[in-house]
Amino acid sequence: MAEEFLNTHNASILLSAANKSHYPQDDLPEVALAGRSNVGKSSFINTLLGRKNLARTSSKPGKTQLLNFYNIDDKLRFVDVPGYGYAKVSKTERAKWGKMIEEYLVTRDNLRVVVSLVDFRHDPSADDIQIYEFLKYYEIPVIIVATKADKIPRGKWNKHESSIKKKLNFDKKDHFIVFSSVDRTGLDESWDTILSEL
């Protein structure tokens, strides 16, 4: 349980950054959270930290346009990466986000693992596959978290998991976690897996 190692409720947003000159300058380990717009990233953060509105959930996808750094008990940081795959964002804007995300993922020494969130209800998008391949190429540790599990009958979970893994060309050495912010499925497993990567 995470509570043995850190007070997960002692969390706050630290800063938002557009480039590396704005990143926190210390050696705290960081966990990046990446995923499509409206995949449930904010809900995932809020559920893990036992807070309702620390990470703002948005009905307007693509609202997170900066890297948002969250301080957790002065021992760990979550880094909320801008949601990708939002159609109404211009190509220029998407390219800018892509460059910002890439710079962080490839150059940040503090980064320990990326939690890549996918929607459990659907096959991974081209963007989901691309970011997974990117992380594998650069040998960045990755945890796949399949969100919104409460929307699928438990009897169909294996089928959905197999389909997602096949489309991603999933590496068996990586972790795959089924998660729901509604009934907290996967909460302890998420924390245990994240902490094992630090």
From Swiss-Prot:
GO biological process assignments: division septum assembly
Record SUPFAM superfamilies: P-loop containing nucleoside triphosphate hydrolases (SSF52540)
Cell cycle as UniProt keyword: yes
InterPro entries, sorted: G_ENGB_dom, GTP-bd, GTP-bd_ribosome_bio_YsxC, P-loop_NTPase, Small_GTP-bd
Any Pfam family: MMR_HSR1
Domain EngB-type G, chain residue ranges per copy: 27-198
GO molecular function: GTP binding; metal ion binding
Name under which the protein is recorded: Probable GTP-binding protein EngB
Source organism of this protein record: Streptococcus agalactiae serotype III (strain NEM316)
